[in-house]
Amino acid sequence: MTRPLSYFHLHLISDATGETLLAAGRAAAAQYANARAIEHIYPLIRTEKQLRKVLEGIDAEPGIVLYTIVDQKLAAIIDDSCAEMGVPSVSVLEPVLNTFQSYLGAPAHRRASAQHVLNADYFRRIDALNFTMEHDDGQLPYDIEEADVILVGISRTSKTPTSIYLANRGIKATNVPIVLGIPLPEVLFTAKRPLIVGLVATAERISQIRQNRPLGNVPSLDTGLYTDRVSISEELAYARNICNRNGWPIIDVSRRSIEETAAAILALLRAHNEKG
């Protein structure tokens, strides 16, 4: 018998943006199919006054409390207050910091938002994002050799979101659509530095996505072909043939999240760069 869906409050308190905490909370919540978290996110909490207001909200809607607060005084207030309210509280980073401290033999500096310093890595990500957004969907740059990754594939194979995810990791990614019967730009076949990866999916999966998100510039007479599984299968065979002829690796994204697809591409990129 299927258990009914239940809901619970999940309070996420951070002295930074809360991205780390949100990812951890959602990863844990995803393990419970019959429970849904009502998320309450409190970023940039760095004073006791701010924290007291947050705690009032938790008292009004009790639930699990996760926090990433490096100030030990504020962390103690959270734990003590939650204990009084009878709700669980967990410092997500504390076990990790303790492990680092034990292994490195040195205490952490405990600086809020230390991971968000405007350093070279930060500006590399911004540069990659600009590159990706300027060269999305076949807008190949004259300086194509600056690209780290070029994704190719038929419509609705997650090329753009995967490119953007990679750019957030500091990877200059661009993408080129494969359209049945239309030759790809010659520059793709002469590029030396970029890793070129083909993205595919099942015809069923692509048809479903295309029905939900039709392509705006498809003429009405072609709309049926755009979502027809037989036609999509022909497109996929055409795309696979191109990739196989050129030795481009292929990733099936049918059952992969964007994160999983990006992880596979990053593994291919490491091997590509090692070969030189």
Swiss-Prot record:
<dbReference type="GO" id="GO:0043531">
    <property type="term" value="F:ADP binding"/>
</dbReference>
<dbReference type="GO" id="GO:0005524">
    <property type="term" value="F:ATP binding"/>
</dbReference>
<dbReference type="GO" id="GO:0016776">
    <property type="term" value="F:phosphotransferase activity, phosphate group as acceptor"/>
</dbReference>
<protein>
    <recommendedName>
        <fullName>Putative pyruvate, phosphate dikinase regulatory protein</fullName>
        <ecNumber>2.7.11.32</ecNumber>
        <ecNumber>2.7.4.27</ecNumber>
    </recommendedName>
</protein>
<keyword id="KW-0418">Kinase</keyword>
<keyword id="KW-0723">Serine/threonine-protein kinase</keyword>
<dbReference type="InterPro" id="IPR005177">
    <property type="entry name" value="Kinase-pyrophosphorylase"/>
</dbReference>
<comment type="similarity">
    <text>Belongs to the pyruvate, phosphate/water dikinase regulatory protein family. PDRP subfamily.</text>
</comment>
<feature type="binding site">
    <location>
        <begin position="153"/>
        <end position="160"/>
    </location>
    <ligand>
        <name>ADP</name>
    </ligand>
</feature>
<comment type="function">
    <text>Bifunctional serine/threonine kinase and phosphorylase involved in the regulation of the pyruvate, phosphate dikinase (PPDK) by catalyzing its phosphorylation/dephosphorylation.</text>
</comment>
<dbReference type="InterPro" id="IPR026565">
    <property type="entry name" value="PPDK_reg"/>
</dbReference>
<dbReference type="GO" id="GO:0004674">
    <property type="term" value="F:protein serine/threonine kinase activity"/>
</dbReference>
<keyword id="KW-0547">Nucleotide-binding</keyword>
<keyword id="KW-0808">Transferase</keyword>
<dbReference type="Pfam" id="PF03618">
    <property type="entry name" value="Kinase-PPPase"/>
</dbReference>
